[in-house]
Amino acid sequence: MNSSHQSKRLIVLVGSPRRDGNSATLAQAIMAGAAEAGTDASLFFLDDYINGFLVDERHATPPADRYGELFLEHFLPAGAAVFCTPLYWYGMSAQTKAFFDRSFSYYSSAYPDAEQVHQRMSGKRIGLAVASEETYPGAAMGIVHQIQEFSRYSHSEFVGLVHGAGNSRGEISRDPRNPLQAARELGREIFTRPYSDYRMDTPRSPQVWQN
């Protein structure tokens, strides 16, 4: 499945409580890159929309928050999504994880429009930006694997990863690996970056990069 049926809208989701922290700084760089490409992009802080976790809706009502608005009105219509999260205990933040967990309320068979939700969840271009205190390359692999498997499960394309290091607010700008430039490029190229994920029977050219 490809993303040809999706719009060219980008949604950037920040799973940090800090509006001026390193995850938010990465998100702003992604937004700047999207603006350079003329991409319609919107940024959302997850804790403005999520204030509770997934519940057993057979016996309890969902949290009275704005998650449904975020998921149905902003995430589903977007053709691309970039998740920006700090590294907490070698995983994504609780806000970010709750975004995925809460979606079950809308794609489970109990939801009247579940089939439509399935279709609109699929075929997106997915990116990930992680801010951590550690420069250890393996620190973020748990998050990377989760986003990779979400993309696979939803027939989406995981097209880019940015991992930057910083502790104090904005310190990520001093990371010599220049993650802010990488984030800017991810935002600029979210709909154009080449993507390949071969299987044994995938038709392919003998060249990766065409002239």
PLM region descriptions:
Residues 12-13, 64, 129, 133, ...:
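A short, mixed-charge helix-start or loop-turn motif at secondary-structure junctions
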Residues 112-159:
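Short, glycine-/small-residue-rich phosphate/pyrophosphate-handling segment
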Residues 17-20, 133-137, 167-170:
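Short histidine/acidic/glycine/proline-rich micro-motifs that form metal-
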Residues 160-165:
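Beta-strand-loop-alpha "switch" segments that mediate conformational coupling across diverse proteins
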Residues 1-108, 112-113, 173, 177, ...:
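N-terminal beta1-alpha1-beta2 submodule of the flavodoxin-like/Rossmannoid cofactor-binding fold
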